[in-house]
């Protein structure tokens, strides 16, 4: 394997149920070792945090806010565009140009689909708080803010 092409959602959920989730301080994000198995310590730590069950949540801001209010984080697959790279943690709606270019195989957007976990929301800001897997040096200490509008667009989430 020479490059990281991301992962598929359902095998990731199955892995969280089987192995669990290691804390970042035990197995930090490092893009140079994506193809290596985690350390035995990471497996041991992860075993204390296994996903117990998965629930399907309707793809709408209101349904996701309800799940969050009930104490459930929501994992989702986001369609990302080049503006994601320069967002500084505030994910903008893609421009019309970005969405049009994404249809051209020669100009495919860099990230494609990317799994992240929605962990909070602010009705005042009309944004979700989302945890990425790229470590604390990315975005706002590993988090980003995604507008409700992004989530409610079936072409983006």
Predicted segments, located by residue:
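Predominantly the structural core of cysteine protease catalytic domains
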Residues: 1-131, 136-157
């Amino acid at each position: 394997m020479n490059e990281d092409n991301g992962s598929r959602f359902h095998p990731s959920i199955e892995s969280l149920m089987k192995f669990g989730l290691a804390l970042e301080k035990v197995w930090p994000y490092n893009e140079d070792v994506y193809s290596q198995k985690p350390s035995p310590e990471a497996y041991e730590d992860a075993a204390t945090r296994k996903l117990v069950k998965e629930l399907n949540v309707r793809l709408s801001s209101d349904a996701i806010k309800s799940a969050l209010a009930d104490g459930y984080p929501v994992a989702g697959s986001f369609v990302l565009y080049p503006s994601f790279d320069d967002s500084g943690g505030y994910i903008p709606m893609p421009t019309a140009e970005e969405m049009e270019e994404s249809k051209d195989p020669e100009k495919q957007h860099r990230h494609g689909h990317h799994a992240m976990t929605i962990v909070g929301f602010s009705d005042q800001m009309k944004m979700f708080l989302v945890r990425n897997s790229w470590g604390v040096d990315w975005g706002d200490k590993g988090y980003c803010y995604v507008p409700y509008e992004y989530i409610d667009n079936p072409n983006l989430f």
